Swiss-Prot record:
Keywords: Membrane, Nucleus, Transmembrane, Transmembrane helix. It comes from Homo sapiens. It is a multi-pass membrane protein. GO terms for molecular function: RNA binding. The gene is NOC4L. This is Nucleolar complex protein 4 homolog.
């Protein structure tokens, strides 16, 4: 294609080719010149070619000049005896197919401007293909959507090679439409299956792209809201699955389960677990199917175990899931490091939630109170100011455990029946012991810790103490608070005012020293 140098020259040359193709079928071969520019290495030329292709094939779709139905082989049609119009439409449909494939490749272009334009053009074709289907309707009211083209789009977004988070942020706005969201979920299932099947070791970039897309999907809360379609429809048929929230939830579930059944990077486990309780579980058709993922995450230890327990707790209390090892897992997370990790506040917030039921057996609550009290002996002051009210709250909720602080004839310290090495709280014999650790902490060097530990010396008040303000307390905050404390009035040390540097005449100091 002859063209003037520079982007402006390319624009004018492409414009002439576009006008020629749209004006006369005899100029159809000019499409090759337009498609050739899509292969250019110049970023600005590619952008002009994408815009031209968008206008060209958008117009052809609207005018019905592309073949409709199962696309036959180009060679077979061109050498056959079909009419010129049919040959033209089949030939142009093949060119349209080549254009879409190239636009799909451009979703991985180094330039974000090129990727953004390619995405915009492909989604325009999706909308136009939906309005002017390239497949024949099998019956009246048959729901048609350009699924293969849309799979191409989603496949480009879920690239195994590069981070597509910026492009995915542009795509998020299309997830507000019910039909594109529904087909995005279906296409994501296919993309995960394809990539995991092709790569023995799936690149981290793919997992990150997939999570970015999946976490952006949010379902409507009520059935009547499923009516906003990207591909405009004259009417909605009740037989369409895409029009029912129940089907959306089923596909949403399939999408997440297909993703979570694979071994993910640890960083992704944490990201998923942070949103599982409010963004995933409430929207699943069968939330209990998440049990495999949550138990697998629970075995990873540390913060991941804690976050997984949060999801399991929801399944137990809201969906009647039976998980006998729940409190045993939580008990196993209590070790000296729990006071020093960055997720300490979240841990104790969730632990307080898990132990909030007054129907828990006394032996179980006693085991947690005793384990925390034992760990408190080596905990820093900022942690003690939170964990001591935590223990007292457990005693308030469960009066049967108050025997731990009222056992006057209990065993000596060297005969404490509590077994700190026992992993099962039911076998720890905590209820036979006492919280002597709290009495020991009454002699702590920090006065606020000593005061907090002394609460057990009186009858515990029934209203619980809120630990929320204490969860994120730091040593720096305690230090600053101590510095700002106002001390008592100055203590008088001598009732007779001093006179002079050596005191009053006649005093011992004045008798033996002189200032002369």
């Amino acid at each position: 294609m002859e063209r003037e140098p520079g982007a402006a020259g390319v624009r004018r040359a492409l414009g002439r080719r576009l006008e020629a193709v749209l004006a006369s079928r005899s100029e159809a071969n000019a499409v090759f010149d337009i498609l050739a520019v899509l292969q250019s290495e110049d970023q600005e030329e590619i952008q002009e070619a994408v815009r031209t292709c968008s206008r060209l094939f958008g117009a052809l779709l609207e005018r019905g000049e592309l073949f409709v139905g199962q696309l036959p082989s180009e060679e077979m049609v061109m050498t056959g005896s079909q009419g010129a119009t049919r040959k033209y439409k089949v030939w142009m449909r093949h060119r349209y197919h080549s254009c879409c494939n190239r636009l799909g490749e451009l979703l991985g272009h180094p330039s974000f401007q090129v990727k953004e334009l390619a995405l915009s053009a492909l989604l325009k074709f999706v909308q136009l293909e939906g309005a002017h289907p390239l497949e024949k309707s099998k019956w009246e009211g048959n729901y048609l959507f350009p699924r293969e083209l849309f799979k191409l789009v989603v496949g480009g977004l879920l690239s195994p090679e590069e981070d597509q988070s910026l492009l995915l942020s542009q795509f998020r706005e299309y997830l507000d439409y019910d039909d594109t969201r529904y087909h995005t979920m279906q296409a994501a299932v296919d993309a995960v299956a394809r990539v995991t099947g092709q790569h023995p070791e799936v690149p981290p970039a793919f997992w990150n792209n997939a999570f970015t897309l999946l976490s952006a999907v949010s379902l409507p809360r009520r059935e009547p809201t499923v009516s906003s379609f990207y591909v405009k429809r004259a009417e909605l048929w009740d037989t369409w699955k895409v029009a029912h929230l129940k089907e959306h939830r089923r596909v949403f579930q399939a999408m997440w389960l297909s993703f979570l059944k694979h071994k993910l990077p640890l960083s992704l486990y944490k990201k998923v677990l942070l949103i599982v309780h409010d963004a995933i579980l409430p929207q699943l058709a069968q939330p209990t199917l998440m049990i495999d993922f949550l138990t697998r995450a629970c075995d990873l230890g540390g913060a991941l175990s804690l976050l997984a327990l949060n999801g399991l707790f929801i399944l137990i209390h809201k969906h009647n899931l039976e998980y006998p090892d729940f409190y045993r897992k939580l008990y196993g997370l209590l070790d000296p490091s729990v006071f020093h990790v960055k997720y300490r506040a979240r841990f104790f917030h969730l632990a307080d939630l898990f132990l909030s039921s007054s129907h828990l057996p006394a032996y179980l609550v006693a085991a947690f109170a005793k384990r925390l009290a034992r760990l408190a002996l080596t905990a820093p002051p900022e942690a003690l100011l939170m964990v001591l009210p935590f223990i007292c709250n457990l005693l308030r909720r469960h009066p049967a455990c108050r025997v731990l602080v009222h056992r006057p004839h209990g065993p000596e310290l060297d005969a404490d029946p509590y077994d700190p090495g026992e992993e099962d709280p039911a076998q720890s014999r905590a209820l036979e012991s006492s919280l002597w650790e709290l009495q020991a902490l009454q002699r702590h060097y920090h006065p606020e810790v000593s005061k907090a530990a002394s609460v057990i010396n009186q009858a515990l008040s029934m209203p619980e103490v809120s630990i929320a303000p204490l969860l994120e307390l730091t040593a720096y905050e305690i230090f600053e608070r101590d510095l700002k404390k106002k001390g008592p009035e100055p203590v008088p040390l001598e009732f007779i005012p001093a006179q002079g540097l050596l005191g009053r005449p006649g005093e011992l100091c004045a008798q033996h020293f002189t200032l002369s």
